[in-house]
Structure formats: structure tokens, C-alpha cells
């Protein structure tokens, strides 16, 4: 979907309709490109295309996911499953790539059935969880906040205890009472959502002011926090 910001031309900085593209499921660059008038100021938010025509602000989760898999393996977990978003999205592809690399480097069994895909919407994680639980996963990584909250609730309903019966790594990208309640029982990958929004806002204003500015790619990094570490401790690659 698109976030569109319209503002009347009250100053030279705002003569345009400016466009944010955030969390879109569009995978065809040509379709997207056809919608954009020439000279229109655009910043892609947490999405990239192979064709680098537009500036972008995104979050890299490669290292936090890689570290989380290695930590789980170090604890003795052997069957580590992962639930990603739509497979065609650039963010999903990076996260699954990090998982695959860590599984290989840690000498864990490479089982394609341990990789499941949701759609990052409500009620999309349960079917994935059923598949992973059927395959006796002893740890699960959930790559999106809403699906992670759904996972916590679903496991609780099944009587499966976090940090005892199964290890969980949760993405945190919005304020959630469910996450707050169980944060000390699972690893977390904290998304810099405020920094992402601020960076996107600053960059779109710059493009409005200087439409011919060079194309840029601003990459932020999420923060990995193991659950048995103090809340003040965290690791980020920023």
C-alpha cells in the first residue's frame, strides 16, 4: 500500500504531492515505476528493488537473525524453524538468507520444511506454527511483530511454555502488551521504527527541496537482545 502526503503549495519546499512507499507487497518494479510521474519525489521505506532508481531507507536484520540462530544452536537447539513474511519481499529474502547461512555455519540440519511463510497479517502465523510443531521444532524465529504476538498466544493456548518447552525469537516492531508480558522468556530483535520513520521523513523533505539529488540507500540495523540478558544490554551493528 502507499502512504501519500498532500500539502498545499504554501512554500517552495512543498510544491508536490510526496509519496512514501512502506510495507508494500508489490514485487514488480515496472508496475511501481509506471505509477510515478517524472520528477516525483520518492523514498522507499523498508523495501528495495534490484533496480536502484529510487532512494530508500531500510532496516537490515541479517546479523541479528544470524546471531540468534547461532545462539540457539549453542544452547543445544537442533531444529530451528523460522516464519517469514511474503517470500517475494526484499526484507523477507534477507531474513531467510541470514537464517540459511547460520544454519549451514552451525552445522544444523537443513530442512526446507522448517522455513514457513506468513503474510505479516493477523491470523497468518497459526498455520505456519502447526507445520513447525508437527516437525518437532525446539526453537522458532518469527520475523514480524504481529505474527510474533499471534505465535505467543497460540503457544500459550496449546500449553507450550516459552523458554521451557520451546525457544522463541520475536521481532518487535510495535508496542504490544503480549510482548511486554513475555519479553523475559524469549529473545528479541528490536526494530528501529522511530529512527526509520525519522530518517524517511528527513530524506523525503530533502528530495522535495532538491529533486535531482543523488540516489541514496540508508540502511539501519535492528538490535538483538537475548532474553537472559538485562534489558539494558543489547547488541546492534549500528
List where the protein language model places each region:
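Short acidic capping loops at alpha-helix termini that bridge into adjacent secondary structure
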Residues: 78-79, 110-114, 161-168
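An alpha-beta-alpha
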Residues: 68-106, 212, 216-229
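Short beta-strand elements in bilobed, periplasmic/extracellular small-molecule ligand-binding domains
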Residues: 7, 100-123
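Alpha-helical recognition/docking segments in bacterial nutrient-uptake
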Residues: 7, 13-70, 74, 128-135, ...
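Flexible loop/turn connectors
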Residues: 131-238
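Short beta-strand/turn micro-motifs composed of small residues
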Residues: 46, 58, 84, 117, ...
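Hydrophobic alpha-helical segments within soluble ligand-binding/sensing domains
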Residues: 55-82, 97, 122-130, 148, ...
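Alpha-helical structural signal in soluble globular domains
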Residues: 34, 94-106, 150-158
